[in-house]
């Protein structure tokens, strides 16, 4: 779950205007639009934070959120969202409840990711879908992973294997941040070799964590990277990009 996962309350940053979040959202929706068969699904957003994805996921049905941090839950409830307090490892829902489950940048925060995937399978309806986004490539591990309390980054093979063990069948698996990957990988490897840490200081509290991580990029850079995200999302509607800093996976319970 997201007890240490960063969140983005409205007074800190608008995620829809930040290139990283907007690019992930567009890529995700572009892939889902070609797979989700109808618009009246029961949807669960695991580790939903303050509910920043609710208005996007609402195009596919009625959304319920699961979060274990009371602070973002309070923000979500002020927005009028249905968010339940609970753990991803022990979800407070009946079996076969949801046709669509999302866990967006969640499982890397979980010590027992297999238990989380098993719970997703339990509450997923037959024929339902599980959508996961998560950081890619353990060799890209950096100080940013540490300050965000990640346990791991994933290879495509590892994620496929863990989903299969939980009972899911992968329908699509693609990488995102394809176009920024070469520069990002180069900078991370240089920092690893020199023992440098990024400019972001390790936060002292959860409140500091999301404010530090969500520090916006400069408007010109943000605009360019947002445009790159539009191009990538268009491509992802048709093809699975072979490399990137993150993974987007859509798996089915059959």
Pin down the residues of each PLM region.
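Short conserved AdoMet
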Residues: 58, 77, 111, 125, ...
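Conserved S-adenosyl-L-methionine
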Residues: 168-178
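Conserved N-terminal segment of class I S-adenosyl-L-methionine
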Residues: 1-96, 100-104, 117, 215, ...
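A short glycine-rich, Lys/Arg-flanked "PGG" loop and its adjoining helix->strand segment in the class I
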Residues: 114-129
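Residues lining the SAM
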Residues: 104-107, 133
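Short, glycine-/aromatic-enriched active-site segment of Class I SAM-dependent methyltransferases
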Residues: 13, 130-152, 156-164
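A C-terminal cap/extension of S-adenosyl-L-methionine-dependent methyltransferases
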Residues: 180-254
């Amino acid at each position: 779950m997201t007890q240490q996962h960063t969140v983005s309350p409205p007074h800190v940053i608008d995620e829809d205007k930040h290139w990283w979040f907007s690019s992930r959202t567009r890529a995700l929706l572009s892939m889902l639009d070609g797979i989700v068969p109808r618009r009246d699904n029961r949807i669960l957003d695991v580790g939903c934070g303050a509910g920043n994805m609710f208005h996007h996921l609402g195009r596919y049905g009625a959304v319920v959120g699961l979060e274990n941090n009371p602070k973002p839950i309070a923000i979500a409830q002020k927005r009028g969202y249905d968010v339940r307090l609970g753990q991803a490892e022990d979800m407070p829902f009946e079996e076969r409840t949801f046709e669509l489950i999302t866990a967006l940048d969640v499982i890397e925060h979980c010590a027992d990711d297999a238990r989380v995937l098993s719970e997703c399978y339990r509450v997923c309806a037959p024929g339902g879908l599980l959508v996961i986004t998560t950081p890619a490539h353990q060799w890209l591990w950096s100080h940013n992973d540490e300050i965000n309390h990640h346990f791991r980054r994933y290879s495509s093979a590892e994620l496929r294997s863990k989903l299969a063990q939980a009972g899911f069948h992968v329908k699509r698996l693609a990488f995102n941040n394809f176009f920024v990957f070469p520069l990002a990988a180069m900078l991370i490897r240089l920092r690893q070799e020199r023992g440098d840490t990024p400019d972001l200081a390790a936060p002292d509290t959860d409140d500091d964590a999301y404010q530090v991580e969500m520090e916006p990029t400069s408007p010109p850079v943000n605009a360019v990277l947002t445009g790159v995200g539009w191009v990538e999302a268009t491509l992802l509607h048709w093809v699975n990009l072979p490399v990137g800093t993150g993974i987007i996976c859509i798996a089915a319970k059959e």
